Regions:
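Generic detector of well-ordered alpha-helical segments enriched in charged/polar residues
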Residues: 12, 71, 101, 105, ...
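C-terminal helix of von Willebrand factor
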Residues: 109-154
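Short beta-strand-loop
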Residues: 1-13, 98-110
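A short, terminal or domain-edge coil/loop segment
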Residues: 33-52, 98-106, 140-156
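Exposed acidic/Ser/Thr-rich ligand/metal-binding surfaces
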Residues: 27-79
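Von Willebrand factor
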Residues: 9-48, 87-99, 125-129
Length: 156
């Protein structure tokens, strides 16, 4: 049902945040799942492009793996050549603290994300714009299939 029709009281005490984001572990699991799916498609002789969009509201605080481990997984995805192209986008939402933006930008640079977007607020308008950006990015990546090259990065 639409968000405006949800009763916020139904969600009281359901979730408690404690700054325990496992960003690196989550990115690794997502990338590995993408890799496995690409390998399965390649075995069936399908060409595939992939897009991994990582959306976070903060820094990593409790992963068991680090930035270098994420980079290794990204590098392996490219080296294994199961994908014609890979587009990786890191999106920080509601990022108001400069140190958080800096840390996410460092993550983007060290790991090799294709693109990093820092969104300062999580307003309805901003999230709608973000959804449109992701939709266009997926479409662009899909249209690049068979071209031998990556899709064009879009501007948020």
């Amino acid at each position: 049902k639409p968000l405006k029709q949800c009763n916020t009281g139904d969600y009281s005490n359901v979730f408690g945040s404690a700054g325990s984001t496992v960003l690196y572990d989550a990115v690794i699991e997502s990338a590995k799942a993408t890799q496995v799916y690409a390998e399965n498609l390649a075995k069936e002789r399908y060409l595939a492009n992939a897009i991994n969009v990582v959306i976070t509201d903060g820094c990593d605080y409790s992963s068991t793996q680090g930035m270098n481990d994420v980079k290794k997984v990204f590098d392996k995805m490219i080296q294994d050549e199961c994908l014609e192209s890979l587009l990786t986008i890191l999106i920080g939402v509601n990022i108001k603290e400069p140190h958080v933006k800096q840390e996410l930008d460092t993550f983007h640079q060290k790991v090799g994300f294709t693109q990093f977007i820092a969104v300062e607020d999580a307003s309805e308008k901003t999230l709608a714009k973000l959804a449109d950006f992701i939709s266009k990015s997926v479409s662009s990546q899909s249209q690049a299939l068979g071209s031998g090259g990556a899709s064009q990065s879009l501007t948020f």
